[in-house]
């Protein structure tokens, strides 16, 4: 079984992505509830649940004599995206995110223990974004309508024989790829390559600089859907504005909200001002859509769907949420701890994980 290449350390500069847009939900950068349903449904995790929050920590394997001699595992997993409650249906840009339970000293050994197998294999690589977290991204988008198996063979890491291997399965669904043209004020949504809908929109109007960044501009770049909520509370508290008498104050309940960054950007239903949709940019940074368009978009959205925004002067930082497609493939591979930095995924085996692996309901 071929293993995929994995990731070298890249320091995550929190300050670089801390500047939010005025659409920020509740003034935080907590990802919205995860999209776990099939395309066309609206199945959600609880609103307070961040992607990957339910991943279980690993426990020692009790059945093995080698494990008993080795003692407790030196390295386990604290969190995995996708979550393990069910087989999640995701978009073609979906990343696999692994957070270990402690800082990883030998990143190359840990990375070599991570395997990705797909029914329709594509080249991919891991990139370290902190001393505990590593992210897998493919060179090109996943091929739609297939199953993927991720396995962390932690027991194969030297000195970590007591650890239990972990696997997760997910399904890549319809290829939902949207392009938001902020100059023409329209979002075109393609599903499996065919134009499915053209939605009039209104993007960020600009005009509010903070620390050299116009936070009222929508960020240009390749975003991914990170989650969605039927109704999202959006406030001005991220600006430090909490007084209702302040002209910059707002607190709005926004329907059909699909989150596309960690700086508070969403595609959502416009809260009034419908006369601007398709004509001018008037939002605080989010992509406002018609009620019918926003509801439809919410319904088809899967975590990992691609939403590319064009036409603004504010560039999307690759460290902002799941904006990993902002890096070129060569840039991405340089984050691997392994020399080659990439390999083709192996075909997914038809058999279920072996008895020594913990499938974590996934």
Residue ranges and their predicted role:
Residues 2-19, 24-175:
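Acidic, low-complexity Ser/Thr/Gly/Pro-rich repeat segments typical of extracellular/periplasmic
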Residues 50, 66-70, 168-191, 209-210, ...:
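Low-complexity, Pro/Ser/Thr- and charge-rich linker/hinge segments at domain boundaries
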Residues 215-232:
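Short, solvent-exposed cationic patches
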Residues 84-87, 136-139, 212, 244, ...:
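Second-shell loop/turn segments in exported
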Residues 97-99, 179, 188, 224-226, ...:
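Soluble periplasmic/extracytoplasmic beta-strand elements of cell-envelope proteins
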Residues 198-200, 222:
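Residue-level detector of high-confidence beta-strand sites
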Residues 101-105, 119, 131, 139-141, ...:
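Solvent-exposed coil/turn segments that connect beta secondary-structure elements
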Residues 174-175, 217-220, 235-362:
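Exported/periplasmic cell-wall-interacting domains
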